[in-house]
């Protein structure tokens, strides 16, 4: 039986076959188990001798089973590793890469420029009241911007802000001069949508207030902005313009070489010295809130520009509507670009 059992163990091709051999010899009804159960029927001397033989046989079978099991497990593992082996020379599976929206990229570029100049960066509410959006910014009731055809009005008398300037008022109410701040966010205009106009777009607006702030400071700031966007040799032009919340007001443009080899002045935004009526309105709001009047007699400048226009020119996007169409063919071109 010993030779038969050991041979069967060595010839077992896999673990299930080895388990069958174990059951055949050492199971509850196995050959060795039955022999051990029959020892009680033998005379004492023969029982002792036969018992020693069967115990030695069982130990030999157990040892052979353990050794063969280790061999078969190792062989099974080797076979599995061979079948599941990774060829490290094959190219990996690339995961889809995300990227910043072009508007976000331009915003980040602008914010970095102003943070280098020491500006705080804030955002404000998109739903505004009429006073902060118009009256506090020296936009009287008869001004065309307050026409129902130009503004999204809500049923409760509030509106979707038409510019980010209301946050300038809110910031001055909460902070005393001197201050330097830029405001970023969405604004809304009730106008027809076309390649260059949307009813929702973005603005970045800046405000500086202190003692002796002049138009020269404003020009220096805009020039630094232009250099940050278009390089150290960027040229800036100012032209007189009208905005109710600044006096004097101006539009600013940079000399731009487009990808087609053309050079021209590119208008970026508007700016000017903060109108005294705005400072007066801010102090009125501060006084109503129990705060001291600190802005009358101060000077400051403000400026604003649209990230969409910069992004359209920078990336050659011909239609502003592409930014918000959720077209993967457009946005997918910016995968992996994280600023």
Swiss-Prot record:
<dbReference type="GO" id="GO:0005737">
    <property type="term" value="C:cytoplasm"/>
</dbReference>
<keyword id="KW-0436">Ligase</keyword>
<keyword id="KW-0648">Protein biosynthesis</keyword>
<dbReference type="InterPro" id="IPR004188">
    <property type="entry name" value="Phe-tRNA_ligase_II_N"/>
</dbReference>
<dbReference type="GO" id="GO:0000049">
    <property type="term" value="F:tRNA binding"/>
</dbReference>
<dbReference type="GO" id="GO:0006432">
    <property type="term" value="P:phenylalanyl-tRNA aminoacylation"/>
</dbReference>
<keyword id="KW-0479">Metal-binding</keyword>
<keyword id="KW-0460">Magnesium</keyword>
<keyword id="KW-0067">ATP-binding</keyword>
<dbReference type="InterPro" id="IPR004529">
    <property type="entry name" value="Phe-tRNA-synth_IIc_asu"/>
</dbReference>
<dbReference type="GO" id="GO:0000287">
    <property type="term" value="F:magnesium ion binding"/>
</dbReference>
<dbReference type="InterPro" id="IPR002319">
    <property type="entry name" value="Phenylalanyl-tRNA_Synthase"/>
</dbReference>
<dbReference type="InterPro" id="IPR006195">
    <property type="entry name" value="aa-tRNA-synth_II"/>
</dbReference>
<comment type="similarity">
    <text>Belongs to the class-II aminoacyl-tRNA synthetase family. Phe-tRNA synthetase alpha subunit type 1 subfamily.</text>
</comment>
<dbReference type="Pfam" id="PF01409">
    <property type="entry name" value="tRNA-synt_2d"/>
</dbReference>
<dbReference type="GO" id="GO:0004826">
    <property type="term" value="F:phenylalanine-tRNA ligase activity"/>
</dbReference>
<feature type="binding site">
    <location>
        <position position="247"/>
    </location>
    <ligand>
        <name>Mg(2+)</name>
    </ligand>
</feature>
<keyword id="KW-0547">Nucleotide-binding</keyword>
<dbReference type="InterPro" id="IPR010978">
    <property type="entry name" value="tRNA-bd_arm"/>
</dbReference>
<protein>
    <recommendedName>
        <fullName>Phenylalanine--tRNA ligase alpha subunit</fullName>
        <ecNumber>6.1.1.20</ecNumber>
    </recommendedName>
</protein>
<dbReference type="Pfam" id="PF02912">
    <property type="entry name" value="Phe_tRNA-synt_N"/>
</dbReference>
<dbReference type="GO" id="GO:0005524">
    <property type="term" value="F:ATP binding"/>
</dbReference>
<keyword id="KW-0030">Aminoacyl-tRNA synthetase</keyword>
<dbReference type="InterPro" id="IPR022911">
    <property type="entry name" value="Phe_tRNA_ligase_alpha1_bac"/>
</dbReference>
<comment type="subunit">
    <text>Tetramer of two alpha and two beta subunits.</text>
</comment>
<keyword id="KW-0963">Cytoplasm</keyword>
<dbReference type="InterPro" id="IPR045864">
    <property type="entry name" value="aa-tRNA-synth_II/BPL/LPL"/>
</dbReference>
């Amino acid at each position: 039986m010993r030779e038969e059992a050991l041979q069967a163990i060595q010839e077992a091709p896999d673990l299930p076959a080895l388990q069958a051999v174990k059951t055949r010899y050492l199971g509850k009804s196995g050959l060795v188990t039955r022999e051990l159960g029959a020892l009680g029927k033998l005379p004492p001397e023969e029982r002792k001798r036969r018992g020693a033989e069967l115990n030695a046989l069982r130990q030999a079978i157990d040892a052979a089973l353990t050794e063969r099991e280790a061999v078969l497990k190792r062989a099974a593992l080797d076979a599995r590793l061979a079948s599941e082996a990774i060829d490290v020379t094959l190219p990996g599976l690339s995961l889809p890469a995300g990227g910043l929206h072009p508007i976000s990229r331009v915003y980040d570029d602008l914010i970095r420029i102003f943070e280098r100049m020491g500006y705080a960066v804030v955002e404000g509410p998109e739903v505004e009241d009429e006073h902060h959006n118009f009256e506090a910014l020296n936009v009287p009731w008869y001004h065309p911007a307050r026409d129902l055809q130009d503004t999204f009005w809500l049923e409760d008398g509030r509106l979707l802000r038409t510019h980010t300037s209301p946050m300038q008022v809110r910031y001055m109410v909460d902070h005393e001069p001197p201050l330097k701040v830029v405001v970023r966010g969405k604004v809304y205009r009730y106008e027809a949508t076309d390649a260059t106009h949307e009813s929702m777009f973005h603005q970045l607006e800046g405000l500086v207030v202190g003692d002796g702030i002049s138009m020269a400071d404003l020009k220096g700031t805009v020039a630094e902005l232009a250099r940050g966007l278009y390089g150290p040799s960027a040229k800036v032009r100012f032209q007189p313009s009208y905005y109710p919340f600044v006096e004097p007001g101006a539009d600013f443009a940079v000399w731009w070489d487009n990808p087609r080899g053309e050079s021209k002045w590119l208008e970026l935004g508007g700016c000017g010295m903060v109108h005294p009526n705005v400072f007066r309105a801010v102090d009125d709001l501060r006084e109503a809130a129990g705060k001291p009047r600190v802005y009358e007699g101060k000077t400051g400048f403000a400026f604003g520009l649209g990230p969409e226009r910069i992004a359209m020119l920078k990336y050659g996007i011909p239609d502003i509507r592409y930014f918000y169409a959720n077209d993967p063919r457009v946005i997918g071109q910016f995968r992996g670009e994280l600023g």
